[in-house]
């Protein structure tokens, strides 16, 4: 297949639309089912690059959950504990390493992952297909699909689920192009190899950087490489727990991603795990209710008479601000990556509140000394990578 004609571009009025290889060669993808759209394909191709790099750095299967050309989550295939299985709604499933990777990628920020495009580093197995089957998703890209997985996925969305197979040996040209307003932009493909050498320049007094934290920092940097800038990523135990994408202020990235990380951890509190949902309440409705319950804005409405009865068998007790603050003190060992330098130490102060102990960022700010001093105040370990990771 040398070109794929699309229904339309970013929006329905943007016609005609297609993808093709500029040199006239075959596309490195095959559409096995469905009719993927312009944004679906942007998500698929960015997501595939991300999971390929995660697998390379970890030697484990990897998955990502993409929405609007940024990852909502990404992870490697580490086994889940019972609490994570419960908050990800997978405690009733048998999980392969690849399925565990997607459960983590989808589960960290389920509100953002609703209607995602999935990328898998490995051949999709039956266990992963069964997990995908029951989630609201636009499609999946992988290097292959076992027969059972393909049969399961082809039945999704009444046979219209987007399934894309990519040639895992494909490599792009060194030079890439795109057009904006009729003007062609040309640049070298971002083939930066993210590896442990980027973490050697530790600038804080605390030089301790365990191997598992090095891996988490590398995961954060790979995620940032394929996230719309400005971006910041919090990672713990092989998975993103908070991604702040596409913000024009660094501190807003750090706050947004930190708030997502906080929500991930708040969902693990006993009062949230024990919420008395009625039988038959769908996962998406549970996700929405939990998001409100752990938030500060609309919880009174959720728990008001005439409202809680729609979701719960009995009225839950409020999760107070003081209780949430106390619970969040238990979050620790978090790694943080930033796609550009921190201009002010307020980013470090905010990161500390979400359990961050290890940081990787380019460095190069006029206020690097103040940022390092703030890290030293909290005994954090910070590496200057010297590499910016903007993505647009």
Give the location of each predicted region.
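C-terminal binding/interaction regions
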Residues: 116, 120-121, 134-164, 169-171, ...
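Flexible, glycine/charged-enriched surface loops at secondary-structure junctions
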Residues: 57-65, 164-166, 229-236, 266-277, ...
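Glycine- and Gly-Pro-enriched alpha-helical subdomains that act as flexible
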Residues: 72-110, 241-341
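Substrate-contacting helices/loops that form the catalytic groove of nucleic-acid
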Residues: 174-209, 267-288, 299
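Active-site-proximal loop/turn and secondary-structure-junction residues that shape catalytic pockets
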Residues: 70, 124, 236-239, 247, ...
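Conserved helix-loop functional segments at active or binding sites
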Residues: 53, 226, 263-267, 353, ...
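Active-site loops and adjacent core secondary-structure elements that bind or stabilize anionic groups
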Residues: 1-198, 213-231
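Gly-rich Lys/Arg/Thr-decorated short loops/hinges at beta-loop-alpha junctions or inter-strand turns
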Residues: 23-35, 108-114, 190-207, 285-307, ...
């Amino acid at each position: 297949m040398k070109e794929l004609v699309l229904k339309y571009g970013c929006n329905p009025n943007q016609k005609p639309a297609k993808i093709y290889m500029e040199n006239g060669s075959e596309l490195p993808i095959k559409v096995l089912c469905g009719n993927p759209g312009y944004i679906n394909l942007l998500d698929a191709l960015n997501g595939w690059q991300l999971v390929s790099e995660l697998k390379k750095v970890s030697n484990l299967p990897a998955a990502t959950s993409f929405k609007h050309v940024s990852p909502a989550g990404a992870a490697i295939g580490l086994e889940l504990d019972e609490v994570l299985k419960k908050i990800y709604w997978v405690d009733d499933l048998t999980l392969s390493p690849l399925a565990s990777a997607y459960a983590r990628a989808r589960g960290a920020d389920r509100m953002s992952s609703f209607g995602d495009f999935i990328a898998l580093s490995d051949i999709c197995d039956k266990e992963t297909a069964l997990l995908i089957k029951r989630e609201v998703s636009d499609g999946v890209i992988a290097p292959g699909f076992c027969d059972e997985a393909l049969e399961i996925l082809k039945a999704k969305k009444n046979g219209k689920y987007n399934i894309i197979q990519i040639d895992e040996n494909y490599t792009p040209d060194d030079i890439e192009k795109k057009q904006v307003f009729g003007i062609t932009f040309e640049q070298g493909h971002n083939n930066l190899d993210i590896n442990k050498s980027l973490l050697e320049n530790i600038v804080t007094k605390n030089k301790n950087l365990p191997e598992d934290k090095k891996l988490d920092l590398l995961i954060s940097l790979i995620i940032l490489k394929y996230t719309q800038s400005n971006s910041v990523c919090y990672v713990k135990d092989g998975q993103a727990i908070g991604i702040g994408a596409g913000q024009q202020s660094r501190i807003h990235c750090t706050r947004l991603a930190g708030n997502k990380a906080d929500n991930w951890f708040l969902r693990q509190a006993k009062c949230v795990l024990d919420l008395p949902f009625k039988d038959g309440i769908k996962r998406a409705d549970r996700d929405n209710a939990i998001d409100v319950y752990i938030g500060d804005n609309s919880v009174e409405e959720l728990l008001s008479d005439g409202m809680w009865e729609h979701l719960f068998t009995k009225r839950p007790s409020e999760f107070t601000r003081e209780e949430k603050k106390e619970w969040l003190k238990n979050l620790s060992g978090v790694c943080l990556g930033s796609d550009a330098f921190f201009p002010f130490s307020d980013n470090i102060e905010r990161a500390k509140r979400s359990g961050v102990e290890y940081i990787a960022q380019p460095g190069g700010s006029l206020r690097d000394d103040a940022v390092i001093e703030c890290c030293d105040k909290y005994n954090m370990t910070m590496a200057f990578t010297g590499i910016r990771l903007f993505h647009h």
